[in-house]
From Swiss-Prot:
This is Large ribosomal subunit protein bL25. It comes from the Bacteria. Pfam families: Ribosomal_L25p, Ribosomal_TL5_C. NCBIfam families: bL25_bact_ctc, PRK05618.1-2, PRK05618.1-5, PRK05943.1. It comes from Saccharophagus degradans (strain 2-40 / ATCC 43961 / DSM 17024). Transmembrane segments: none annotated. SUPFAM superfamilies: Ribosomal protein L25-like (SSF50715). Coiled coil: none annotated. One of its GO terms (cellular component) is cytosolic large ribosomal subunit. This is one of the proteins that binds to the 5S RNA in the ribosome where it forms part of the central protuberance.
Amino acid sequence: MSNEDFILNAEARDVSGKGASRRLRREAGLVPAIVYGGRKNPQNVTITLRELTKHLENEAFYSHIITLNIGDSSEQVILKDLQRHPATNFAMHADFLRVSKTKKFNTKVPLHFINEATSKGVKEQGGKVQHSMTELEIACLPADLPEFIEVDLANVELGGIVHISDIVLPKGVESIALQQGEDHDLPVASIFKPKGVAGDEDEEAEGDAE
Protein backbone atom coordinates (compact mmCIF):
# COMPACT_ATOMS: atom_id res chain seq x y z
CA MET A 1 0.00 0.00 0.00
CA SER A 2 1.06 3.57 -0.57
CA ASN A 3 2.00 5.70 2.43
CA GLU A 4 0.79 8.83 0.66
CA ASP A 5 -2.27 10.72 1.83
CA PHE A 6 -4.50 12.22 -0.82
CA ILE A 7 -6.79 15.07 0.16
CA LEU A 8 -9.20 16.78 -2.22
CA ASN A 9 -11.22 19.87 -1.43
CA ALA A 10 -14.68 20.10 -2.96
CA GLU A 11 -17.77 22.26 -2.79
CA ALA A 12 -21.35 21.08 -2.97
CA ARG A 13 -23.23 22.13 -6.10
CA ASP A 14 -26.97 22.31 -6.60
CA VAL A 15 -27.08 22.75 -10.36
CA SER A 16 -26.54 19.72 -12.60
CA GLY A 17 -26.82 18.97 -16.29
CA LYS A 18 -24.55 19.26 -19.31
CA GLY A 19 -25.04 23.01 -19.75
CA ALA A 20 -24.23 23.78 -16.13
CA SER A 21 -21.20 21.48 -16.22
CA ARG A 22 -19.83 23.20 -19.31
CA ARG A 23 -20.17 26.61 -17.66
CA LEU A 24 -18.35 25.40 -14.56
CA ARG A 25 -15.43 24.13 -16.60
CA ARG A 26 -15.27 27.14 -18.92
CA GLU A 27 -15.91 30.04 -16.56
CA ALA A 28 -14.70 28.89 -13.16
CA GLY A 29 -12.05 26.25 -13.88
CA LEU A 30 -14.04 23.70 -11.92
CA VAL A 31 -14.62 20.01 -12.58
CA PRO A 32 -18.10 18.65 -11.79
CA ALA A 33 -18.12 15.39 -9.85
CA ILE A 34 -20.49 13.08 -8.02
CA VAL A 35 -20.04 11.22 -4.73
CA TYR A 36 -22.17 8.12 -4.23
CA GLY A 37 -22.38 4.83 -2.35
CA GLY A 38 -22.87 3.84 1.25
CA ARG A 39 -26.16 4.71 2.92
CA LYS A 40 -26.11 8.34 1.81
CA ASN A 41 -27.71 9.91 -1.21
CA PRO A 42 -25.51 10.82 -4.18
CA GLN A 43 -24.06 14.32 -3.91
CA ASN A 44 -22.97 16.64 -6.70
CA VAL A 45 -19.75 18.54 -6.00
CA THR A 46 -17.11 20.60 -7.80
CA ILE A 47 -13.32 20.39 -7.58
CA THR A 48 -10.82 22.84 -9.00
CA LEU A 49 -9.28 21.57 -12.21
CA ARG A 50 -5.83 22.60 -11.01
CA GLU A 51 -6.02 20.57 -7.79
CA LEU A 52 -7.52 17.49 -9.44
CA THR A 53 -5.00 17.56 -12.32
CA LYS A 54 -2.11 17.65 -9.86
CA HIS A 55 -3.35 14.48 -8.15
CA LEU A 56 -4.11 12.73 -11.42
CA GLU A 57 -0.42 12.95 -12.34
CA ASN A 58 0.31 10.48 -9.52
CA GLU A 59 -0.48 6.86 -10.44
CA ALA A 60 -1.20 6.01 -6.80
CA PHE A 61 -4.17 8.40 -6.79
CA TYR A 62 -6.17 6.02 -8.99
CA SER A 63 -5.99 3.17 -6.47
CA HIS A 64 -5.86 4.90 -3.11
CA ILE A 65 -8.27 5.98 -0.42
CA ILE A 66 -8.92 9.70 -0.81
CA THR A 67 -10.12 12.12 1.85
CA LEU A 68 -12.68 14.30 0.11
CA ASN A 69 -13.48 17.46 2.05
CA ILE A 70 -16.90 18.88 1.19
CA GLY A 71 -17.44 22.10 3.07
CA ASP A 72 -17.22 21.26 6.78
CA SER A 73 -17.54 17.49 6.31
CA SER A 74 -15.28 14.84 4.82
CA GLU A 75 -15.76 11.50 3.06
CA GLN A 76 -13.45 8.54 2.51
CA VAL A 77 -13.70 7.74 -1.19
CA ILE A 78 -11.96 6.18 -4.17
CA LEU A 79 -11.90 7.47 -7.72
CA LYS A 80 -14.33 5.19 -9.53
CA ASP A 81 -14.55 6.82 -12.95
CA LEU A 82 -12.99 9.73 -14.81
CA GLN A 83 -14.06 11.38 -18.05
CA ARG A 84 -11.43 13.28 -20.02
CA HIS A 85 -11.69 15.66 -22.94
CA PRO A 86 -10.79 13.72 -26.13
CA ALA A 87 -8.55 16.50 -27.46
CA THR A 88 -6.99 18.16 -24.39
CA ASN A 89 -7.12 15.15 -22.03
CA PHE A 90 -8.29 17.49 -19.25
CA ALA A 91 -10.61 16.00 -16.62
CA MET A 92 -14.25 16.73 -17.45
CA HIS A 93 -16.13 14.75 -14.79
CA ALA A 94 -15.23 12.46 -11.90
CA ASP A 95 -17.13 9.78 -9.98
CA PHE A 96 -16.14 9.04 -6.38
CA LEU A 97 -17.34 5.99 -4.43
CA ARG A 98 -17.74 6.21 -0.66
CA VAL A 99 -15.97 3.41 1.21
CA SER A 100 -16.38 1.99 4.70
CA LYS A 101 -13.54 0.69 6.86
CA THR A 102 -15.53 -2.46 7.61
CA LYS A 103 -16.89 -3.30 4.15
CA LYS A 104 -15.12 -4.74 1.13
CA PHE A 105 -15.48 -2.88 -2.14
CA ASN A 106 -14.58 -3.51 -5.76
CA THR A 107 -12.05 -1.45 -7.68
CA LYS A 108 -9.33 -1.77 -10.31
CA VAL A 109 -5.62 -1.47 -9.58
CA PRO A 110 -2.72 -1.27 -12.06
CA LEU A 111 -0.47 -4.24 -12.78
CA HIS A 112 3.29 -3.72 -12.61
CA PHE A 113 5.27 -6.27 -14.63
CA ILE A 114 8.71 -7.02 -13.22
CA ASN A 115 11.73 -8.97 -14.53
CA GLU A 116 10.58 -8.76 -18.15
CA ALA A 117 14.00 -8.18 -19.72
CA THR A 118 15.68 -10.84 -17.57
CA SER A 119 12.98 -13.50 -17.89
CA LYS A 120 13.99 -16.84 -19.40
CA GLY A 121 11.73 -16.39 -22.40
CA VAL A 122 13.21 -13.00 -23.27
CA LYS A 123 16.85 -13.05 -22.21
CA GLU A 124 17.68 -16.68 -23.01
CA GLN A 125 15.16 -17.55 -25.74
CA GLY A 126 14.74 -14.28 -27.64
CA GLY A 127 11.04 -13.80 -27.02
CA LYS A 128 8.97 -10.67 -26.51
CA VAL A 129 6.46 -9.90 -23.77
CA GLN A 130 2.84 -9.20 -24.61
CA HIS A 131 0.52 -7.71 -21.98
CA SER A 132 -3.10 -8.83 -22.14
CA MET A 133 -4.09 -6.79 -19.08
CA THR A 134 -2.79 -3.61 -17.50
CA GLU A 135 -5.11 -3.56 -14.48
CA LEU A 136 -7.01 -6.06 -12.35
CA GLU A 137 -10.38 -5.75 -10.67
CA ILE A 138 -10.17 -6.71 -7.01
CA ALA A 139 -12.21 -6.77 -3.81
CA CYS A 140 -10.76 -5.75 -0.46
CA LEU A 141 -11.18 -3.64 2.64
CA PRO A 142 -9.93 -0.05 2.43
CA ALA A 143 -6.99 -0.86 4.72
CA ASP A 144 -5.85 -3.64 2.35
CA LEU A 145 -6.06 -1.65 -0.90
CA PRO A 146 -2.74 -2.02 -2.78
CA GLU A 147 -1.30 0.81 -4.87
CA PHE A 148 -0.48 -1.77 -7.55
CA ILE A 149 -0.03 -5.53 -7.98
CA GLU A 150 3.22 -7.05 -9.21
CA VAL A 151 3.36 -9.71 -11.90
CA ASP A 152 6.73 -11.48 -11.85
CA LEU A 153 7.83 -12.79 -15.25
CA ALA A 154 11.28 -14.02 -14.17
CA ASN A 155 10.59 -17.73 -14.73
CA VAL A 156 8.27 -17.48 -17.73
CA GLU A 157 9.69 -19.25 -20.78
CA LEU A 158 9.04 -18.76 -24.49
CA GLY A 159 5.42 -19.68 -25.21
CA GLY A 160 4.51 -19.32 -21.56
CA ILE A 161 1.33 -17.61 -20.42
CA VAL A 162 0.65 -15.99 -17.06
CA HIS A 163 -2.98 -16.18 -15.94
CA ILE A 164 -4.78 -14.29 -13.20
CA SER A 165 -4.50 -17.33 -10.93
CA ASP A 166 -0.69 -17.16 -11.25
CA ILE A 167 -0.54 -13.71 -9.66
CA VAL A 168 0.40 -13.59 -5.99
CA LEU A 169 -2.19 -11.26 -4.50
CA PRO A 170 -1.51 -9.26 -1.33
CA LYS A 171 -3.13 -10.41 1.89
CA GLY A 172 -6.80 -9.54 2.07
CA VAL A 173 -7.13 -8.98 -1.68
CA GLU A 174 -9.33 -11.13 -3.92
CA SER A 175 -9.70 -11.25 -7.69
CA ILE A 176 -13.23 -10.54 -8.91
CA ALA A 177 -12.66 -12.64 -12.02
CA LEU A 178 -11.58 -15.73 -10.08
CA GLN A 179 -14.66 -15.43 -7.87
CA GLN A 180 -16.69 -16.09 -11.01
CA GLY A 181 -15.06 -19.43 -11.78
CA GLU A 182 -12.20 -21.00 -13.74
CA ASP A 183 -13.62 -19.79 -17.06
CA HIS A 184 -12.69 -16.25 -15.99
CA ASP A 185 -9.04 -17.08 -15.31
CA LEU A 186 -7.88 -14.93 -18.21
CA PRO A 187 -4.35 -14.44 -19.59
CA VAL A 188 -2.44 -11.51 -18.12
CA ALA A 189 0.82 -11.71 -20.08
CA SER A 190 2.70 -14.06 -22.39
CA ILE A 191 6.08 -14.42 -24.07
CA PHE A 192 6.05 -15.10 -27.79
CA LYS A 193 8.58 -15.44 -30.60
CA PRO A 194 8.58 -12.36 -32.87
CA LYS A 195 7.79 -12.96 -36.52
CA GLY A 196 10.83 -13.27 -38.75
CA VAL A 197 13.06 -14.60 -35.98
CA ALA A 198 14.47 -18.00 -36.88
CA GLY A 199 14.28 -20.65 -34.20
CA ASP A 200 16.89 -23.18 -33.21
CA GLU A 201 15.31 -25.85 -35.40
CA ASP A 202 15.52 -23.61 -38.47
CA GLU A 203 19.17 -22.85 -37.78
CA GLU A 204 19.96 -26.56 -37.38
CA ALA A 205 18.17 -27.37 -40.64
CA GLU A 206 20.20 -24.75 -42.48
CA GLY A 207 23.40 -26.18 -41.00
CA ASP A 208 22.53 -29.71 -42.15
CA ALA A 209 21.77 -28.47 -45.65
CA GLU A 210 25.26 -26.98 -45.96
